[in-house]
Structures are given as C-alpha cells and as structure tokens.
Amino acid sequence: MILAIDIGGTFIKFGLVDDDFKISNQSKVPTPTTLDDFWLTLEHIVSSHKDIISGIAIACPGEINSKRGFIFKGGLIPYLMAIPLGSRLTRTFQLPVKVINDADAAALAEARYGSLQDLDCGAALVLGTGVGLGLVSQEFLLSPLSVTQYLRAPSPQSMSQTSLPFQWELFMHGLVSLVDNKGSAVGFVHEASQLLGLNQDDGPAVFSAIEGNQSEDLNLLFKDYCHEIAVLVLNLQSFFRLEKVVIGGGISRQGTLIEGISDAYEELFKDKPELGFEPITIQACHFHNDSNLLGAASYFASENDL
C-alpha cells in the first residue's frame, strides 16, 4: 500500500493506493501557512499510516527534482523554497519517498489509465490555486529534451500576414494570463462567490447559479474565465502537436465548465482557418481531482519497479 499525498495551495489531500491503483481512505487538511506547520502536518499524516504503507508518493506544485525529491520552488506556496522533501521524510520514517510535480502526476495518471491513453502527444491542464501543465506521450512524461520532437513546425498558413498578428496577440494574452494567474480555479470561485454575495467560497453554489442563469454578471465572469483557459489551450497547441487536452483539478467535475471551455476554444478557431492546425478535443480528466494522487503513486511504483 502506498500513501499518496497531493500538496495544493488550499488543501493537502491524501489517500491509500493499492496494487491495482484504487484509492481508499481519502481525506484532506487545509494547507498550512508556515513551513513549521507544514512539516508537522506531513509528519502527522505519515505517522497515522506508517504501519500499513510501503512508501510515500507526493504530488507537489512547482519546480521539482523528482530524482532527488527536492523542491526548488513550490508553485504559489511561498515557504516551499529549496526543500529536501523526499530525503527528510525518508530519514524520519525509514520509507522510500518519491516526489513529482502535480500536473505531471495528473498527466501521467491520465496517460496510463485515463483520458490520455494511446496518444503521441497529450496535455493535462490542472486548474487549482494556480495552473499546472503536464505533457505526455503514450505512457510517459515528456522531458524538456524529449518534448522538442513534438514542437510544431511553422506552416505556410501560420506564417501568413493575417495569422501572425493573431498568433502574437494570442501569445501575449496567454503570457499576461499566466503572470496574473487568471486561470486559477480558486480565484474564479472566490470572485464568483463574492459576486453572488455568499458568506464563503462555494464552488457547487457558483455552478448551480451559472446553470440556473441567475446573474448576467456571473455569466460574463464565467465566459471570461472559460476564454482564458481556451487561450491557454490554443497557445499550447500552437507550440506542440497536441492530440488532446484534459482539464484537471476539483473544478473539472463541473461539466458546465468543460462545455464552456470547449465553446470558447471553438469560438477562437471559428474565423482563423489560417492557423495551420485542426481543433483538438478538450475534456475532463477521467479521474478528476484524484489524478494527482494516482499519478504520484504510479510514478512511485515505476521508479521502484513495483
């Protein structure tokens, strides 16, 4: 049994993953605000399961050296800087530990067991506190070196005088969106909850209001959010020969969101046949928010020959 842990900007989720990659005993705790509390929380989670597990698999945002289990920068969690996560937990609990980027974990789970199976080039966009990206080919993650063979070569259509300004505008929009974190699902739900006058952020209530067409302002906010994600997808497609993109994170359970992103993506394509590539499929991760846990466990198993 593997203890899989998904470190997010809002919650730390965890569960037990068996040899058939089924998850049980899932739970979550709020992500601590300090490094000391972070260590205490992780150690409590592991201690509670230590007697029944053979290893620890961790999905974490940011820049990760997976071989060493070292976090260079933990995404939007400010205190996760230069953290030897794997070695410290191994030293404390005498258990093998593997750490992988959370979006890579989601993409790996979908490539091996879910919606990105049997593709030469697929991507997972994980929408949470921030936005994560994982690229896969068949059952494997694409490394910075291997990804170069999937770069899209310029076509005559894409180099046309009408296409180039649009592509530049698209690129700059996407860059600003990433810098400002406009793709954040947590940010969208927070803004939408405030718009509805809710006492606290409530994703299900937000989407119920969207589906019930309760507020024109909310509809516009939702349309803008879907447009931001569609721009990210189209930007990715302009660089890589993608066959499919899946949307991950807890928000991916909302069918209305996937439909909204797909509609916005089709709208971007409608008047731009000169882009030089065809539309691709956008759908939810098969395992939704569990993709991170399953992918981390799968990475642990493959690295330890289990």
Give names to the regions the model predicted:
Residues C60, T129, G249-G250:
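Short secondary-structure boundary segments
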Residues V97-A103:
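General beta-strand structural signal in soluble alpha/beta enzymes
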